[in-house]
Amino acid sequence: MCNQNCRGWYEGDPIMEEYHDHEWCKINHDDRFEFEMLCLEGASVGLSWKTIMHKREAYRKAFHYFDIDSCAAMTDQKLEKLLSDKGLIRNRSKILSVRKNAQVVKKIQAEFGSLDAYIWSFTDGKQIDGGWTVPEEIPTKSDISVKMSADMKKRGIAFAGVR
């Protein structure tokens, strides 16, 4: 569905345009990238994706560019310090969730071989193409997203719900 029909939600915003043209709808099998998206989605709860994308570089710097091992090892002191970082959403639960989620992701990697293998296990390794032509057609949840969300929650991933 990545086509000119999407332009309305990013036109005139270079950060959103870059995200749309180079990441949205693009398959990426990198665990670090997938962990970054998981964390940023968590940070976006109750906010717009645009807000988070405009804070993305601050998040990358604060959270070791989403290196999973580094995030899993972050100290309470370091996380507390981030609560005063104006570049981040200064919500205690959201900040602390990055470390917690990294620790859970490490367990997922041990079980599945990678975060990527875990994520793709919900679709039997196949990309889903809903045939949507405009953003308004894209559902906010599906049977697969509900199943994935429930499994992530069961494993201890924070902010992994469907809206």
Positions of predicted regions on the chain:
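HhH-family (HhH-GPD) DNA N-glycosylase catalytic core used in base-excision repair
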Residues: 1-163
